[in-house]
């Protein structure tokens, strides 16, 4: 948000409250509660691991694509994208490499999210590699924390495409709410 505003772009409205649901399976109860209290709600999902039936139930509570339902894939033109795919692969890989220094990232495509023809986001590809090569669980939050620190320390390191993707996402969220 800070980086976008520092570059003259619109950030998220201060009226917006981000409420993690703990996964798509918990989405329906939260969305029902929000709509029952006449609060505007929007849902932002990755395109992977959405339990069957969740997307089908959302229209009954007036949340559907184009009306409150956003998918990361809409902002990177890549099916299965997650928030990590909004960043340039190089920037994300540098953070991953600092957390997992022995990880052979050369086995993962360095193409942009648009160029990758895979239906899983970059974090899922890295998780597979970590689990296969190192026999441990990929901890996305550790990479996310480092990513956040790097953005705060050196906001100029975010490339224009990343800024544009977040700007479009925030504009859409602001429009919905």
Question: In which residue ranges do the predicted regions lie?
Answer:
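Active-site-proximal structural scaffolding
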Residues: 27, 34-36, 76, 80, ...
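Activity-critical C-terminal alpha-helical subdomain
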Residues: 46-138
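Residue-level recognition of the N-termini of beta-strands and the immediately preceding loop/turn
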Residues: 13-17, 67, 138, 142-143
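Conserved helicase/translocase motor-coupling segment
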Residues: 1-59
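Terminal low-complexity/disordered tails
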Residues: 117-177
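Generic structural signal for hydrophobic core residues of well-folded globular domains
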Residues: 3, 90-91, 95, 99-100, ...
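Residues at structural and domain junctions
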Residues: 16-20, 69, 73, 112, ...
């Amino acid at each position: 948000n800070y980086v976008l505003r520092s570059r003259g772009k619109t950030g998220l409205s201060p009226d917006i409250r981000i409420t993690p649901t703990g996964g798509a399976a918990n989405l329906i109860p939260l969305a029902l509660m929000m709509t029952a209290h006449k609060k505007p709600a929007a849902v932002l999902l990755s395109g992977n691991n959405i339990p069957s039936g969740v997307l089908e139930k959302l229209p009954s509570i007036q949340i559907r694509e184009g009306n409150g339902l956003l998918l990361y894939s809409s902002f990177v033109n890549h099916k299965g994208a997650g928030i990590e795919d909004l960043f340039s692969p190089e920037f994300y890989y540098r953070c991953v490499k600092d957390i997992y220094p022995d990880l052979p990232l050369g086995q993962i495509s360095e193409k942009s999210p648009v160029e990758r023809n895979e239906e899983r986001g970059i974090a899922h590809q890295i998780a597979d590699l970590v689990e296969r090569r190192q026999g441990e669980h990929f901890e996305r939050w550790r990479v996310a924390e480092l990513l956040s620190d790097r953005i705060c320390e050196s906001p100029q390191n975010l490339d224009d495409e990343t800024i544009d993707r977040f700007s479009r996402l925030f504009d859409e969220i602001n429009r919905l709410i």
